[in-house]
A protein has these predicted regions:
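Glycine- and acidic
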Residues: 8-12, 32, 60-62, 179-181, ...
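Short, basic/aromatic recognition patches
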Residues: 20-44, 80-84, 96-102
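Short, small/polar residue-rich loop motifs at catalytic or cofactor-binding pockets
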Residues: 43-47, 107-109
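Regulatory sensory and allosteric helical modules in signal-transduction proteins
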Residues: 54-61, 73-98
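Extended active-site and interfacial segments that coordinate phosphate-rich ligands
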Residues: 65-79, 113, 125-159, 273-289
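Accessory "access/gating" subregions that flank catalytic or transport cores
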Residues: 197-277
């Protein structure tokens, strides 16, 4: 890391910020686990919390399930694209469980809170959690997304601090145990508000420029480290293949899983071209997964 590239920070502050954002997402994770109403979140850890730049790039993730890491960032970016930066305000909270945005199933509900400092958008706090019920049928007999349950398009749960009570009513009317759903909703809000509060403490202590440049340095260093490790792998094409017995609907019909990894220099391409086509059962995944 050179001072010319990051004049507002230095290696010491950057390392403090790196550990600081890890601590923030760790506290978000702990608060969610302590306040969630269903065991899928606090026992199975079917959730993820994170901090993201104002462009939606990942700053830090408090991992529950690693499979959400990319989906979280893509979900934040989708919400930014949907509303536009100029239509995102202090007090807003955005929500969706759209499977084609999150890359997952409808039970995974994602809340995103924009973080402002002195009137300027500087980051986002986000929480994806598995609700025990979102309506719909049992997964083992579901063959289309409409059977899975309530679909929540990208929208604002809160607009400039005003909660969308109609949306809450819609959720209550479409789940079997409303108290559980609303309890998990409140737990997720607690998590993202914790992220906002703690991240702003770092910003106020070191200044927004130092925080922004430290985060850029952390990302650059992370990319450099990953590329260095990739260089240690001999150039070539590596392939692996497995299968699932079936998709739960077409019994006995194998579902092939094939992956090809191409390494060239410090770059790696993961090719899923030969993986199975979409199946009738509930094993399909979106690109963000």
């Amino acid at each position: 890391m050179g001072n010319a590239a990051y004049p507002a920070t230095n290696p010491v502050i950057t390392e403090i910020v790196r550990n600081g954002v890890i601590a923030v997402t760790g506290e978000m994770k702990s608060n969610l686990m302590r306040t969630a109403y269903n065991t899928i979140i606090y026992e199975a850890l079917d959730f993820t919390v994170g901090l993201f730049t104002r462009d939606g790039a990942t700053i830090s993730i408090g991992i529950g399930l690693p499979m959400f890491i990319r989906g979280m960032s893509e979900t934040v970016k989708a919400k930014i694209a949907h509303f536009g930066i100029d239509n995102i305000h202090p007090g807003d909270i955005m929500v969706t469980n759209d499977a084609y945005t999150t890359g997952s199933h409808l039970n995974h509900v994602t809340f995103t809170l924009p973080i402002f400092h002195d009137g300027e958008l500087i980051a986002f706090a986000c929480c994806m959690g598995h609700w025990i019920d979102i309506g719909g049928r049992l997964g083992s007999v579901t063959t289309d997304i409409f059977s899975e349950g309530l679909q929540i398009p990208i929208c604002k749960y809160a607009d400039k601090g005003v909660v969308n009570e109609f949306l809450e009513d819609v959720i209550r009317m479409n789940v079997r145990i409303p108290s559980r759903a609303m309890g998990d909703l409140r737990a997720q809000l607690t998590a993202i508000k914790t992220g906002e509060r703690r991240f702003l403490e770092l910003v106020r202590r070191y200044g927004p420029d130092a925080i922004e440049q430290s985060i850029s340095a952390i990302m650059d260093n992370g990319e450099a480290a990953a590329r260095k490790r990739t260089l240690a792998i001999p150039d070539g094409t590596y392939e692996a293949e497995s299968f699932m017995d079936d998709d739960g609907i077409d019994i006995g019909k194998r579902v092939p899983i094939k992956v090809r990894v191409i390494v060239k220099g410090d770059a790696m391409t993961i090719d899923l071209t030969d993986i199975s086509d979409q199946v009738r059962g509930f094993y399909n995944s979106g690109i963000t997964t």
